[in-house]
Amino acid sequence: MLCHQCQETIKGTGCTQMGVCGKKDNTANLQDVLIYTLKGIAYVSNKTGITNNEIDSHIVDSLFATITNVNFDDKYIIERIKKGLKLKNDLRTKCGCTPEKCGELPDFVTWDAKNDLEILEKAKSKEISLEIPENEDMRSLRKITLYGIKGLCAYLHHANVLGYNDEEIQKFIKKALIDISDDLKSPEELTALVLETGKYVVDTMALLDKANTESYGNPEITEVNIGVKNNHGILISGHDLKDLEQLLNQTKGTGIDVYTHSEMLPAHYYPAFKKYDNFVGNYGGSWYLQKTEFDSFNGPIVMTTNCLVPPADEYKNRVYVTGVVGYPDVKTIPVNEDGTKDFSKVIEHAKLCKPPKELETGKIVGGFAHNQVLALADKVIDAVKSGAIKKFVVMAGCDGRHKTREYYTDFAKKLPKDAVILTAGCAKYRYNKLDLGDIGGIPRILDAGQCNDCYSLAVIALKLKEAFGLNDVNELPIVYNIAWYEQKAVAVLLALLYLGIQNIHLGPTLPDFISPNVAKLLVEKFKLNGITTVNEDMNLLLE
């Protein structure tokens, strides 16, 4: 095992025996086998020009399952490997993809396994390693692309669930899997692939934005209760809005309240969910606090996506996972063939539990996605022209458990009163309960939504560029101080780079999988920087 795909990797250099996230050595290796298998499917599909929805969804959902804090279940990973091998072999049989027809075939195409034991043996082999080739810059470029398409697949999965897809994005995922396995690719070609990944991340986020807004309406300014009521409750975490919709429909009239947790908070901003009387508020804060918060919630918890922390015994029997999320010996809500899910077991469980324990009281405000902010465009533009707003500070991204992330709370507190924070993702929990006031009625914290809603922040920036008649988005009074944690944040970073955004400050640390030479390239081409101290960065960003 060598895993350094997240920001919290041990000593910043990689987890080698067990992940900080809780992922075991054998699970990490099996996930590498799964990715290896996906490369084989992509290769055969690309060579033959044959694909279908089953192949596409298998690749997308499998890559999503390998993201940090999504799936810890070896049985689940092995079953996906088996299915992948069958899809690949059926495709080869159907089209006769032999060396004579398709040329010399790589091992990930020809490899097969008759049983679980052979899969476990493959997990020990060198072929599956992401540490190939020996050149660290080539490895770095390959990993940046791989982690970027993992994040892309998370967003595409959610769009697919709502019935939205894009053939060109699906083609690119396969192309990227093949290209990062091609030893003949030059550093220049792999660098171009990194930026091409950013292009398709933008397309995917746009697709998901369309899926969400056409399904549930455009987010609008909303006050969200952070206290509790006295009824039985169900807590839903993750990002899947369709799961939430089904849960709300099934709990209607049961007397059970539904609370969001962490990245599900922005669901409250969508008009479609405001009709549910039992959709009562948000419970707790960021994902890494769940061991305390899940315990005190008292009722069942539904994990629709990441971030799942290995559940403690005190509440493990109340955790339900669904979709691509997995953990050994935790109850699963399966998806039916028509895409529906039956949450009746969760509902009956909730009736046996005490109401949630109150953690805090009050309200937080959000719903500032692109449609809502652009509706306020005249007010925003006037505030900038008058000097009432001097800077917009994009502080989007991820939260995490390390103490170094207190930097973002301190940074938000010390911003001058003429600065407005634009945020999306769970990074918001470092400052979204601070009372920073407003500027002429414009709140100084504008929350666009989930991490994928960084797309909204990009749209806002591009529209403001037009409104001010500027040639370059970097001429706007917008600076970027972004926190990353896992692969969706990598995808967002690549999207911003593709859009030409420069002078991004990324923290709390730069990714270990970026080699010194590749880091130098990013600094020279995009002026990408790390963070230092609050005061130093404040002076640098607000100069």
Curated annotation (Swiss-Prot):
Any one GO molecular-function label of the UniProt entry: metal ion binding
Alphabetical UniProt keywords: 4Fe-4S, Cytoplasm, Iron, Iron-sulfur, Metal-binding, Oxidoreductase
Catalytic activity: A + NH4(+) + H2O = hydroxylamine + AH2 + H(+)
CC per GO annotation: cytoplasm
Metal-binding keyword on record: yes
Residues that bind hybrid [4Fe-2O-2S] cluster: H239, E263, C307, C398, C426, C451, E486, K488
Localization of this protein: Cytoplasm
Function: Catalyzes the reduction of hydroxylamine to form NH(3) and H(2)O.
Descriptive protein name: Hydroxylamine reductase
Organism of this sequence: Methanococcus vannielii (strain ATCC 35089 / DSM 1224 / JCM 13029 / OCM 148 / SB)
